[in-house]
Every structure is written in C-alpha cells, then in structure tokens.
Regions:
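Phosphate-backbone recognition surface of nucleic-acid-processing proteins
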Residues: 204-246
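Conserved small/polar residues in nucleotide/adenosyl-binding loops
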Residues: 277-283
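Glycine- and acidic-residue-rich phosphate-binding/metal-coordinating active-site segment common to enzymes
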Residues: 148-170
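Helix-hairpin-helix
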Residues: 164-216
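Short, polar loop motifs at secondary-structure junctions
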Residues: 131-135
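Noncatalytic, basic helical substrate-engagement surface that gates or grips nucleic-acid strands
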Residues: 1-127, 137-153, 231, 237-238, ...
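Catalytic core of IPPT-family isopentenyl/dimethylallyl transferases
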Residues: 265, 269-275
Length: 287
C-alpha cells in the first residue's frame, strides 16, 4: 500500500527509483522496530479474493474506476510484484502471500496466532505499519500497536470492540460495503444509502448486546454480511491455516541463508550496500 501510494503521488514508473524507495522504507522500519518487535513480516495481497466470492460487490467500484483511469495500473502492479518477488528471494524478511487472501487476513491471523487470554505469558508484540484504519480492531489484543506512514504517527482507539461494531454497522464505502440498513447493490448501482444516525448505531449495538430475537431484526442479515467482510476474525479457517503454515515454513536458518544474497543483489541493482550491513552475512576478517 505504501509503495503503490508513492507511485501514484510521484507519477513515476521508474523501476529503479521505486525499488530504492521500497528498500529504503523497509530498511527504516526494520531498524526502528526490530529490537522491540522482532523480525519484519511483509503481508501481501493475492488474487482470487475470498471476500469477492462471498460478496461480488466487494471493491467492485475500484475495479471499475481502474478500468476507466488513465493511470497504468497494470504497469504499477507489474513493477510491485517483481520487486516483491526479489525481496522474498534475496532478503531475510518473511514475505507471506496466500492465494485468496488480502494482507488484512495475514495480519489478522498472525497477531492472534498465540493468544494470551489468561495473561499468563508475554505474547509476541506486533507493530502494524499501515495507514489503514481497518486494523484498529486488532488493538483489542494488548500486544498490537499500529503506525501510520501517511500521518507519521501511531494510531489508537479507546475501545477497539466498539470501534469494530461501528465499522460493521456503518459499512465501508471505500470497499463497497454498505451500511446494514442498505441493500447489497447500493454502491454499484449508484444509489444512496439509507441514513444511519449515531443514535441508530447505539440502538443496534444495544440490541446486539442484549442478544434477543436478533434473527427477527430487519438489519440482522446485513449485519452478518458486513461482519463477514470487516471482522478480521472471519477469515476462513482453511486460509488461516495456510497463512500460519507459510509463516512457520520460513525458518530462522532459511532467513539467515538469504543474508548471503543481499550484497550481490544490492550491487546488481545499484543500491548502496553500506546502508544494509545489518542484513548481510558478516565477512571474515583478513589475517
């Protein structure tokens, strides 16, 4: 997301410049957070999105807008995919891409992989580097924080559970998800959503807490629709297992061996190796 935004803002398809920009960003965040949060994990969107299969209107307008845009989206994604593959092959970062999943699914799965419900041990701490507020729901876990590269500050929310309920009820226009009072096709057909006041939101939250006769509520079907799409705990179990398997497969000794590829890669791509000595294998001293 960070890299794509930079391409759009700078209006450049200079592959070398984009490569430098991405590598510099990764190096900066790796050095900033490694000591407290451990090794960097790169979560990448894949094709065959399961949400679109569940709800065909999901992000439908984005695809339509890209089809009419003068911006060369195919070239942008070609460059980003190429650099992503280079990083996975030549750097000691764990890169996870699972067919059918968005990066959101990967992050939402990994931060819950070792839950600490009883507070009897210290779970792995996570710093999510993203400006996407969809991740605020994950702050219900005390080991999760988020930094926004766009705002250059940490994002936080007082009550992540209430935040998630509000998000589900109000929907997400950017992702083509209507509020729970509106029909599935409201955005793709260009209709207006039914108005949703905060008073109505609060009433629905109270009904959900009471838990009585929810199936009879006119909005309950759409609430379930939105929860499936927005709540990151709803990622299908088979995809969660594949995410965890991918993560576990990238063992420390495998990452260590990739350090031997960093220096040749940087030289071949005219990057300054001196800035990346923390990622390369130590050289033997002479004598």
């Amino acid at each position: 997301g960070i890299a794509l935004a930079s391409i759009i803002i700078n209006k450049t398809f200079d592959e070398q410049m984009i490569r430098h920009m991405i590598l510099n960003s990764l190096r900066m965040y790796h050095k900033r957070y490694k000591e407290e949060y451990g090794e960097m994990i790169l979560a990448v969107d894949a094709s065959n999105n399961w949400r679109r299969k569940t709800f065909p209107q999901y992000k439908a307008n984005r695809k339509k807008d890209r089809g009419t845009s003068t911006f060369d989206w195919n070239e942008a994604f070609r460059i980003l995919n190429k650099i992503r593959e280079e990083i996975a092959e030549n750097f000691p970062y764990t890169v996870i891409r699972v067919d059918g999943c968005e990066a959101d699914d990967i992050i939402g799965t990994l931060v819950t992989m070792n839950p600490d419900h009883n507070n009897d041990f210290k779970p792995q701490k996570y710093m999510i580097v993203s400006s996407d507020r969809d991740f605020l729901q994950l702050q219900r876990f005390r080991n999760v924080r988020q930094f926004s590269p766009l705002l250059k500050k940490e994002l936080s929310v007082d009550n992540p559970r209430v935040y998630l309920q509000n998000h589900i009820i109000r929907g997400d226009k950017g992702d083509g998800i209507p509020n729970i009072l509106s029909e599935d096709n409201v955005f793709v057909e260009g209709f207006r959503q039914k108005p949703m006041s905060q008073k109505k939101v609060d009433e629905i939250i109270q009904d959900l807490e009471d838990g009585e006769l929810l199936y009879a509520a006119s909005w309950y079907r759409n609430y379930c629709r939105n929860k499936k799409l927005i709540d990151l705990s709803e990622t299908p179990p088979e995809l969660r297992r594949e995410i965890i398997n991918n993560f576990m497969a990238d063992k420390p000794d495998t990452r260590w061996m990739r350090r031997g590829k960093v220096y040749p890669y940087l030289v071949a791509n005219r990057c300054n190796p001196v800035s990346y000595t923390h990622l390369t294998l130590p050289t033997k001293s002479s004598g």
